[in-house]
């Protein structure tokens, strides 16, 4: 074995956060050591809580054994450009192991439906889940969780007055929809919306959480920049339909998170409304918005495809009734959300 063979093998491994191979991403340290069938080298990650670290290290090992020598004993060390920073400052009431933003480039692709069902799926798996409805101008979580008439109360914690999130179906939740007239439009400038969002994060009694999901507004706005400045996001999920016009904006969403000023790992793409299945013909699939658009985009950008969700009437009805489909154990759609939840 020769060092150049190792380098060439690692060109076959993509880092999901950028879509580039390990060499192009500058992740290989100049420390390749070879002794007989033993080879060692180091991979450099930006931070020590990189969500892709384990999978990338494994893929690198497999690449050497596949493209260089099947009997190679591969030893991979990890180094970090930045040490792990706490997701929040110590004084913040928000303490979450994973903070995940769920985004769509275009409205109407089912992002909020996906977010609500993922939150419930995680809660049903025994996780402590918080959900922030950050879609200030179009909050939909109160409706989807059947909590339109709920109003958060204040609690005292450590000498501070905090907002107590509404808890429903095992999910702690806050939304601007709890504080405004549901029949009135929220007409705020970017600064007002960002300040309201900041208060829902910093002045709320979230407690200890395993997952904190953020339902982002579609597109790009001040709200997205506010979140990045307030929280150290574990990663982002992009929701799209297979329709070409939606894929254009989904691509922009991935590019936004990969921008060096944002620098948030893209955990994957969810293709919603992947096909239509009528209730009377559960085995039939009609690709009314296109076939595998989200899947193909994920492959092109080098990010995981977390799942494909069909367009079925029961998902829409469950959300409108305030009891998302993920609550229906055994339902085919609930199983899909459960599988996606386990991947994140």
PLM region descriptions:
Residues 1-32:
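N-proximal, solvent-exposed amphipathic alpha-helical segments enriched in charged/polar residues
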Residues 10, 28, 96, 107, ...:
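Residue-level signature of catalytic and energy-coupling elements of molecular machines
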Residues 24-27, 35-103:
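Extreme N-terminal, non-catalytic leader segments
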Residues 57-58, 210-211, 217-308, 313-317:
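Conserved catalytic-core segment of NTP-binding enzymes
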Residues 98-136, 262:
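Walker A/P-loop phosphate-binding motif and the immediately C-terminal alpha-helix
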Residues 122-183:
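Phosphate-binding loop that captures ATP/GTP phosphates
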Residues 152-155, 176-191, 198-226:
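Switch II (G3) loop of P-loop NTPases
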Residues 321-331:
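C-terminal boundary of histidine-terminating zinc-finger modules
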């Amino acid at each position: 074995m020769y060092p150049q063979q190792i380098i060439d093998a690692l060109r076959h491994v993509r880092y999901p956060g950028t879509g580039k191979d390990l060499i192009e991403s500058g992740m290989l340290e100049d420390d390749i050591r070879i002794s007989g069938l033993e080879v060692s080298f180091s991979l450099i990650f930006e931070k020590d809580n990189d969500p892709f670290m384990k999978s990338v290290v494994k893929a690198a090992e497999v690449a050497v054994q596949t493209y260089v020598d099947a009997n190679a004993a591969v030893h991979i060390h990890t180094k970090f450009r930045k040490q792990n920073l706490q997701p929040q400052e110590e004084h913040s009431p928000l303490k979450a192991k994973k903070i995940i933003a769920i985004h769509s480039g275009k409205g109407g692709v089912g992002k909020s439906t996906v977010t609500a069902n993922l939150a419930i799926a995680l809660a049903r798996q025994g996780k402590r889940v918080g959900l922030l409805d950050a879609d200030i101008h179009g909050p939909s979580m109160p409706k989807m969780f059947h909590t339109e008439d709920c109003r958060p109360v204040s609690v005292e914690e450590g000498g501070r007055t905090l907002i107590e999130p509404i808890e429903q179906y095992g999910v702690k939740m806050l939304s601007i929809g709890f504080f405004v007239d549901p029949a009135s439009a929220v007409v705020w400038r970017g600064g007002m919306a960002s300040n309201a969002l900041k208060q829902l994060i910093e002045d709320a009694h979230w407690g200890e959480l395993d997952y904190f999901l953020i339902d982002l507004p579609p597109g790009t706005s001040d709200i997205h920049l506010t979140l990045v400045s307030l929280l150290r996001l574990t990663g982002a999920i992009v929701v799209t339909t297979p329709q070409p016009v939606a894929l254009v904006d989904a691509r922009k969403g991935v590019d936004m998170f990969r921008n060096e000023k944002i620098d948030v790992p893209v955990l994957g793409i969810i293709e919603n409304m992947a096909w239509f299945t009528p209730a009377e013909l559960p085995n039939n699939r009609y690709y009314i918005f296109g076939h595998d658009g989200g899947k193909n985009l994920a492959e092109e950008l080098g990010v995981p495809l977390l799942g494909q969700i069909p367009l079925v009437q029961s998902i829409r009805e469950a959300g409108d009734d305030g009891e998302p489909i993920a609550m229906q154990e055994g339902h085919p759609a609930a199983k899909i959300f459960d599988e996606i939840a386990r991947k994140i």
